[in-house]
């Protein structure tokens, strides 16, 4: 490794990843006491940030010794030392520029103090707060984002599905007539295909929607399949149904802007496969309110979160409206809700549960951290399929972005696995006005 550095950690880094102390190699880490004070405010509650705060404090308690405040406590083999900076550190440079005594400015003071104390050693603030990084740079302090789980090139996940032109028309004819598809060796693809990648094959006179099946090493035709009254309106939606319906694909990511049909397609596919699962679970994170704010709303827990679950019920109503109100399909949906065979609820309510034989759909997954996504996936028991939907550019969490959110992180880590499939939906199917707003505003 290069020259050893000092890193000063902001509270939001810990709330994002409670294991962050293990990700700074042999460099030393400094923890301002004000960070511990801020963590104390987050320990109560059942959201992921509350869990992260508690876990970090527990980990800190295990490594605490008398040297933590003086010479630093060793973090383990291949890692540096951890220091807790107790008390208030005065920094004339910080005080002159930012006279208000708030936690952010106290953290900046620690960075400045370390810089003055060790002029030959880089001292760097690590924070996910963009404004705090701007303040640090304005007075000449080094700073950076926490990049351990960042995905560098997200553009590749937002492309339309590949269209391969100049394909031998006889191959396309054979794909149409073959149930098993054709061996991939018969095609001359320039790039290696990812497992379950969907694409269009075109010749000068015909075309076919296709998918690479990694289990049979074949290129198979994608059929236009209808699920519980919902019919795909374009090639991308056909691709989505293809991977949503395949029992061999246990993990699916559907991305795309608003109006592309991500959640509706996932729910329709789940309903179409009901005989294969004991339960359908549709959940989304509550982003707009913290736990404390949620408590001030009237009603019980379900009534408090109901407004944030409404978009999921709206998708269910779209499916119901495909049938007559007195039809067996609508009655079946209502019976499923009454018997908890179809459950729509806030993501926080399912934390800690083991999900077996469940078709689990997590909506707005771009608002989850990588650790949250991992935690949810590890809850999957036998016979469970997990689908994550979201727009990786529409982030509502203050310390996540298009490169660090859990959805894009999952796609990046899983895209070469046979059990995983990703489909990006580009074409909006709501209304002309909705499409115009998504593209221009």
Predicted regions and their residues:
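Conserved glycine(s) of the Walker
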Residues: 259-261
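Pre-Walker A (Motif I) flank of P-loop NTPase domains
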Residues: 247-253, 357
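N-terminal pre-P-loop "Q-motif" helix
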Residues: 229-248
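Active-site-proximal, substrate-binding regions of enzyme catalytic domains
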Residues: 3-124, 130-227
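Hydrophobic anchor at the beta1->P-loop junction of P-loop NTPases
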Residues: 254-256, 266
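Conserved P-loop
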Residues: 264-332, 397-418
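Conserved coupling/interface region of RecA-like P-loop/ASCE motor cores
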Residues: 41-74, 310-312, 408-441
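Conserved RecA-like ASCE ATPase "motif II neighborhood" in helicase/translocase motors
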Residues: 16-18, 338-361, 365-375
């Amino acid at each position: 490794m290069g020259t050893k550095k000092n890193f000063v950690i902001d509270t939001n880094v810990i709330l994002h990843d409670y294991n962050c102390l293990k990700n700074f190699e042999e460099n030393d880490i400094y923890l301002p006491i004000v960070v511990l004070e801020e963590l104390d405010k987050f320990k109560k509650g059942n959201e992921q940030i509350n869990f992260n705060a508690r876990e970090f404090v527990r980990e800190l308690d295990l490594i605490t010794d008398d040297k933590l405040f003086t010479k630093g406590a060793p973090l383990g083999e291949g890692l540096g030392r951890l220091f807790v900076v107790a008390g208030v550190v005065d920094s004339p440079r910080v005080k002159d520029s930012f006279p208000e005594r708030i936690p952010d400015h106290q953290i900046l003071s620690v960075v400045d103090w370390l810089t003055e104390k060790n002029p030959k050693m880089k001292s760097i603030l690590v924070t996910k707060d963009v404004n705090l990084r701007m303040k640090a740079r304005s007075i000449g302090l080094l700073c950076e984002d926490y990049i351990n789980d960042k995905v560098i090139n997200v553009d590749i996940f937002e492309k339309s599905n590949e269209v391969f032109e100049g394909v031998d028309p006889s191959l396309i004819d054979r794909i149409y007539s073959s149930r098993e598809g054709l061996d991939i060796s018969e095609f001359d693809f320039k790039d290696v295909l990812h497992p379950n990648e969907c694409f269009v094959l075109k010749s000068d006179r015909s075309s076919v929607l296709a998918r690479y099946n990694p289990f049979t090493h074949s290129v198979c035709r994608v059929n236009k399949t209808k699920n519980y009254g919902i019919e795909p309106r374009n090639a991308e939606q056909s691709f989505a149904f293809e991977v949503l319906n395949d029992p061999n694909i246990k993990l699916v990511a559907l991305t795309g802007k608003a109006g592309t049909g991500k959640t509706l397609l996932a729910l329709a596919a789940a309903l179409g496969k009901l005989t294969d699962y004991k339960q359908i679970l549709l959940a989304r994170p509550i982003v707009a309110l913290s736990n404390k704010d949620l408590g001030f709303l009237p009603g019980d827990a379900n009534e408090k979160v109901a407004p944030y679950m409404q978009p999921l019920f709206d998708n269910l109503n779209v499916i119901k409206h495909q049938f007559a109100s007195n039809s067996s399909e609508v009655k079946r949906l209502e019976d499923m809700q009454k018997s908890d065979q179809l459950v729509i609820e806030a993501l926080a309510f399912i934390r800690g549960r083991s999900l077996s034989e469940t078709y689990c759909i997590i909506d707005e997954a771009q608002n989850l951290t990588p650790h949250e996504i991992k935690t949810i996936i590890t809850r999957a028991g036998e016979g469970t399929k997990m689908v994550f939907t979201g727009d990786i550019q529409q982030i509502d969490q203050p310390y996540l972005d298009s490169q660090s959110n859990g959805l894009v992180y999952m796609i990046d880590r899983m895209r070469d696995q046979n059990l995983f499939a990703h489909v990006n939906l580009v074409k909006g199917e709501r209304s002309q006005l909705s499409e115009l707003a998504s593209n221009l505003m």
